[in-house]
Amino acid sequence: MSADTETLARKVREEVIKPEQSTLISPDRQSPSLLRREATVEPRFELFHFVFSVCSQKVRGTLMEKGVTFGSNELTILPPQSENYCPQYVRLRLRSEAAAKHRPVSSFTGQSSVDSEGFDPLVVPTLVDHETGRILADSKAICLYLCDALSGGTDLLPADIREAVLKQVQLADTTPHVALLYGADPDGDRRPESMQAVMPGIHAHKIDAVRRNIPLADGDPLLLEAYQHKIVKEEAAASFVINEPQMRTAISKAEQLVTDLDRDLGASTGPWLFGDRFTLADLFWAVSLYRFLWLGYSGFWKDGAGKPRVEAYANRLFARPSVKDAIIQWPGHPPSENVIHLLSNA
């Protein structure tokens, strides 16, 4: 690993991450209970993430399916803490491959995909590979990297169906999760009451948090530019989530994705999208379907929606160990009355 990458990662871990939020996750200990300072091994992979981030959930699930030990560094990304806005963390992401490859974020579409949004240096997750010195900061790219770099564990990207799996991964990656989280359904807010209570004015709070960090960017034009782009994005988001036509379009797109998923499941000869083989596509859909359920959008496939294949598929996904450990049971997940039955069956 390059000394520069090591220094950047260490500064975030030591100056931003709370000690109790820096833990070691291993195949035989998949909950964040072993403090990093008490661990006897230095992991190859180090993940900076947040419990509730769908992008973080995809990466956590991939790491667990591959059966690797990794360092877990949890950031609190909600205002007023907004630890993902700290200069140390933003500088780490600005050195990532995604920062060099993608245009800076400058708009809001309701998705979290780098392909549609551009690169946002102020979000999660970020993965550091201590063996190669690479810094990866796009969840889809991180998961593909792990699939190609690691031969052990579940073969999430089989060579003979790689392109078909990637097509499904891309579909799941374009789901407008962010819009459905921050914005209400104009025809009746379905989100948990606790979430409805904290969302009004959330983008203004995020912008304030960014502005508090701007003085720390003195002498660092790249960092300053990152903060400026973030403000533009959050201003656009604030307008998007109260625009009824845009919200209806986002909800309609999400429901159509589930309809298309039901069709694709009908072509499968097994429990997963590609027969008996659990792939990265299934993991990405697990994250999407769980978020829909959590938010109150399970009506996309339940309650007379006529999609029994998706309903059965979701139940299988939610029972999979990696999905339970990386998403459903990961400590600190915000409460939702829509998923209590899954937690009680844990």
Curated annotation (Swiss-Prot):
Domain GST N-terminal: 43-154
Coiled coil: none
InterPro entries according to UniProt: Glutathione-S-Trfase_C-like, Glutathione-S-Trfase_C_sf, Glutathione_S-Trfase_N, Thioredoxin-like_sf
The protein's Enzyme Commission number: 2.5.1.-
Disulphides: none
Keyword annotations: Aromatic hydrocarbons catabolism, Detoxification, Plasmid, Transferase
Molecular function per GO: transferase activity
Protein family membership: Belongs to the GST superfamily.
Function: Catalyzes the degradation of 2,5-dichlorohydroquinone (2,5-DCHQ) into hydroquinone (HQ) via chlorohydroquinone (CHQ).
PANTHER family associated with the record: GDAP1, ISOFORM A (PTHR44188:SF1)
Protein name, entry field: 2,5-dichlorohydroquinone reductive dechlorinase
Taxonomic classification: Bacteria, Pseudomonadati, Pseudomonadota, Alphaproteobacteria, Sphingomonadales
